Amino acid sequence: SLTKAERTIIGSMWTKISSQADTIGTETLERLFASYPQAKTYFPHFDLNPGSAQLRAHGSKVLAAVGEAVKSIDNVSAALAKLSELHAYVLRVDPVNFKFLSHCLLVTLASHFPADLTAEAHAAWDKFLTIVSGVLTEKYR
């Protein structure tokens, strides 16, 4: 679980991130599809060209879910229960993709907030996103 210091770091950075959530979400997905093209198979109906309306809309949804997890940092499992079920039972997303997405989000955060993403903040976000990924894959077990 996260320490109090880690929760503080995540909460304070989220304030900055949330004001750019759409851009960050879109860039995160663009990175995901560029770096891990196999992830595109889950979006056969999407226009996956950089900056497309569908990519922007889904990027916004992804960051909104991260925001829900931040708001419910002590109970991420409850906050993301419906998403967990959707991705496991309906969409059947390979769990490794959540790790890839987390990595791409960290890279995007580093590019947007280089001064904020200190080693300590990077570690806190990595730990938090590992928790989020764990929640999103818990229905697979």
UniProtKB/Swiss-Prot annotation:
One of its GO terms (cellular component) is hemoglobin complex. The keyword Acetylation applies. Gene3D superfamilies: Globins. GO terms for biological process: cellular oxidant detoxification; hydrogen peroxide catabolic process. The modification Phosphothreonine is found at residue 28. Keywords: Acetylation, Heme, Iron, Metal-binding, Oxygen transport, Phosphoprotein, Transport. Disulfide bonds: none annotated. The keyword Acetylation applies. Coiled coil: none annotated. GO terms for molecular function: heme binding; iron ion binding; oxygen binding; oxygen carrier activity. InterPro entries: Globin, Globin-like_sf, Globin/Proto, Hemoglobin_a-typ, Hemoglobin_oxygen_transport, Hemoglobin_zeta. SUPFAM superfamilies: Globin-like. Residues 1-141 form the Globin domain. The modification Phosphoserine is found at residues 52, 72. Pfam families: Globin. The modification N-acetylserine is found at residue 1. Heme b binds at residues 58, 87. Belongs to the globin family. The zeta chain is an alpha-type chain of mammalian embryonic hemoglobin. Heterotetramer of two zeta chains and two epsilon chains. This is Hemoglobin subunit zeta. It comes from Sus scrofa.
